[in-house]
UniProtKB/Swiss-Prot annotation:
Role: Catalyzes the folate-dependent formation of 5-methyl-uridine at position 54 (M-5-U54) in all tRNAs.
This protein's GO CC annotations: cytosol
The EC number(s) this enzyme carries: 2.1.1.74
The species this protein was found in: Staphylococcus epidermidis (strain ATCC 35984 / DSM 28319 / BCRC 17069 / CCUG 31568 / BM 3577 / RP62A)
Biological process terms in GO annotation: tRNA methylation; tRNA wobble uridine modification
The protein, known as: Methylenetetrahydrofolate--tRNA-(uracil-5-)-methyltransferase TrmFO
Cofactor requirements of the protein: FAD
Subcellular location: Cytoplasm
C-alpha cells in the first residue's frame, strides 16, 4: 500500500481516525503542531489531551453516550480502549487518569508501524487523501483555507447555542402550535406566560449562576447573539421585546395575546427534538434547568443539550458534509471532531472513527460505510449531515432523541432507553458483518 493519508490534528478525533486507518494497513502521516506550537488550552505534547474534564460521561446503556461508547468498543476504538485501561473510580461515569489515558494513546500511535508522526503546524490543507481534525482552536491560517474550500458562510468561530429538549417531555396541554402572525405553516410550539409567570421567571434569571469564561475565550465572539441573561440585566422589558415577544402569537384557545411567549423550534428532521428560540446562554447547567422548568409546559422537560456560548470552530456540516464526514464534491477530503458539529469527547472520537473507516474503505475500494440510524454512531453522522435547521446549525452531543422512534411506544423512560440501546447494538453487530 503506497497511498499515504494525512491526518491533521492528534486530538481525540484525529487519533481515532489515524488508528482506524493504520489498523487497515493504510500508511498515515499524523500531523500535530504541539509542542512546536501550543494552543491556549493545551499543556502537554501528548495526543488526545483532555483539556477540560477527565470524565467521558455516563457508561450505562440507559445513557446515550454510554451506548455510543459500547458501540465504539464493538468497533475497536482506540479512544475507548484507552479510557477503559486508564479508568478511575467515578460511580456510573467513565472517568480516566488523563495522563495515563493520553500516554497510552500517544505510545500506541507513535509505535504503530503504519503511522509517521510529524510535529509541525499546518497552514494549508495537504494534497491527497486528508482528514482535518484540528478542533475548536484551529489556527487562523488553516481556518482561512477551510473557508476558501467550503465557502465564506460555512465556517463558524463561536458556538452560541440555545438549549435543546425532548419533545416527549413537553406538556402539550400547556403549549400551542403557531407561527408569528400565522405566516407560513405553524412551525413553532409556543409556551404562553402570564405576567406573574414572567416575573417569576425573570427574577430567577437574574439570580441564576453564570458559568466562568476561559481566558482564551474572552474575545468578543458574540456580536448579535447576546445571552438571554444579559438581555434580562438590561431591564424587565428587554426580553419582552426580544426572544419572548408575544406580538402575533395569540393563544388559539383564548384568542388573547399572552404577556410573554417562549418559542420552541423543531431541531431535527424526525421532530423529536426542539430548541428554545433565542435562549443562547452562559448560565451554569443546573441554573439552566431550574430556569427552563419555570416555563409553562416545560416543568418536567428533559434537556438533551444545554445552552452554551464559547469559542469554537465548526463548519456548517449539513450543507457541506455527508454521512461519511466527507466534504461534498471532494472525494479526498474528510473532517472529524468538534469542527464537524459533534459535541463532546466521545462524540468527537466517534466521528474520527467513522471518517477513518470510510477513508480506508475508499482507498481499499471496499465501498462506503453508512452506519444505521438506529445506532448512536449512525444517528450522529446523520444529524450532522441532515440537520433540519441547517441555516442555524449548532453542535450536538449523543442523545436518544436522535434515534428513530421505536415501533411500539414505551412510556417508561428507562425501559425505552434500554430498548433503544439493545436495538442499537443489534443493528451495529448485524451491520459489522457486512464490513
Amino acid at each position: 500500500m503506497t497511498q499515504k493519508v494525512n491526518v491533521v490534528g492528534a486530538g481525540l478525533a484525529g487519533s481515532e481516525a489515524a488508528y482506524q486507518l493504520a489498523q487497515r494497513g493504510i500508511k498515515v502521516n499524523l500531523i500535530e503542531m504541539r509542542p512546536v506550537k501550543q494552543t491556549p488550552a493545551h499543556h502537554t505534547d501528548k495526543f488526545a489531551e483532555l483539556v477540560c474534564s477527565n470524565s467521558l460521561r455516563g457508561n450505562a446503556l440507559t445513557n446515550a453516550v454510554g451506548v455510543l461508547k459500547e458501540e465504539m468498543r464493538h468497533l475497536d476504538s482506540l479512544i475507548i480502549t484507552s479510557a477503559d485501561k486508564a479508568r478511575v473510580p467515578a460511580g456510573g461515569a467513565l472517568a480516566v487518569d488523563r495522563h495515563d489515558f493520553a500516554g497510552y494513546i500517544t505510545d500506541t500511535l507513535r509505535n504503530h508501524p503504519n503511522i509517521t508522526v510529524l510535529n509541525e503546524e499546518v497552514n494549508h490543507i495537504p494534497e491527497g487523501y486528508t482528514i482535518i481534525a484540528t478542533g475548536p482552536l484551529t489556527t487562523e491560517h488553516l481556518a482561512q483555507e477551510i473557508v476558501d474550500i467550503t465557502g465564506k458562510d460555512q465556517l463558524y468561530f463561536y458556538d452560541a447555542a440555545a438549549p435543546i429538549i425532548e419533545k416527549d417531555s413537553i406538556n402539550m396541554d400547556k403549549v400551542y402550535l403557531k407561527s408569528r402572525y400565522d405566516k407560513g405553516e405553524a412551525a413553532y410550539l409556543n409556551c404562553p406566560m402570564t405576567e406573574e409567570e414572567f416575573n417569576r421567571f425573570y427574577d430567577a434569571v437574574l439570580e441564576a449562576e453564570v458559568a466562568p469564561v476561559n481566558e482564551f475565550e474572552k474575545e468578543k465572539y458574540f456580536e448579535g447573539c447576546m445571552p438571554f441573561e444579559v438581555m434580562a440585566e438590561r431591564g424587565r422589558k428587554t426580553l419582552l421585546f426580544g426572544p419572548m415577544k408575544p406580538v402575533g402569537l395569540e393563544d388559539p384557545k383564548t384568542g388573547k395575546r399572552p404577556y410573554a411567549v417562549v418559542q420552541l423550534r423543531q431541531d431535527d428532521a424526525a421532530g423529536t427534538l426542539y430548541n428554545i428560540v433565542g435562549f443562547q446562554t452562559h448560565l451554569k447547567w443546573g441554573a439552566q434547568k431550574e430556569v427552563i422548568r419555570l416555563i409553562p409546559g416545560l416543568e418536567n422537560v428533559d434537556i438533551v443539550r444545554y445552552g452554551v456560548m464559547h469559542r469554537n470552530t465548526f463548519i456548517n456540516s449539513p450543507d457541506v458534509l455527508n454521512e461519511k464526514y466527507e466534504l461534498k464534491g471532494h472525494d479526498n477530503l474528510y473532517f472529524a471532531g468538534q469542527m464537524t458539529g459533534v459535541e463532546g469527547y466521545v462524540e468527537s472520537a466517534a466521528s474520527g472513527l467513522v471518517a477513518g473507516i470510510n477513508l480506508a474503505h475508499k482507498i481499499l475500494d471496499k465501498g462506503e460505510v453508512i452506519f444505521p440510524r438506529e445506532t448512536m454512531i449512525g444517528s450522529m453522522a446523520y444529524y450532522i449531515s441532515h440537520a433540519k435547521n441547517e441555516k442555524n446549525f449548532q453542535p450536538m452531543n449523543a442523545n436518544f432523541g436522535l434515534l428513530p422512534s421505536l415501533e411500539k411506544r414505551i412510556k417508561d423512560k428507562k425501559e425505552r432507553y434500554e430498548t433503544q440501546a439493545k436495538r442499537a447494538l443489534e443493528y451495529l453487530d448485524n451491520y459489522k458483518q457486512t464490513l
